[in-house]
Amino acid sequence: MNDIRNTAVPADVKQPEGLPAEDEFFGRMNDPTAAASIKGVCGDEMEFYLVIRDDRIEQVRYHTNGCANTSSCGRAVARRARGRNVTDALSISAGEIIRSGECEPAAGRHCAILAVTTLYRAIADYLLAP
């Protein structure tokens, strides 16, 4: 996996179609404390960027090239993760995201799993850092 933590954000990055313009969590982040990127079985890619201080997630952003449902799941996960202790954020589940009504339950199962798994990997990036 490439280290996406040190990748500059291109100026022409646009939000995916169908994503609300007011999504404060969408976009890449320069110099995060931790980051992760995963490509799902459907071909959608999800990235999470975290700024962590004293084991608390102070800032979180996600980026995806996926469908509106993938974006909705990324937003739902990011909103739940912000402000939480890193170990507490590991309790966010795909089932919780699906039950929240923030994504299409039938089509969104794999989207929710992709979003949550990417968050988990970003947290692991933080916890396992030297």
Per-segment meaning from a language model:
Residues 72-88:
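Iron-sulfur (Fe-S) cluster-binding segments and ferredoxin-like electron-carrier domains
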Residues 64-73:
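Short, thiol/selenol-centered motifs that function as redox-active sites or metal-ligating centers
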Residues 37-41:
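Short Gly/Pro-enriched turn/cap motifs at secondary-structure boundaries
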Residues 2-35, 58, 84-130:
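C-terminal binding/interaction regions
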Residues 44-54:
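Short beta-strand elements
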Residues 54-63:
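Short, well-ordered strand-loop elements centered on a beta-strand within folded domains, enriched
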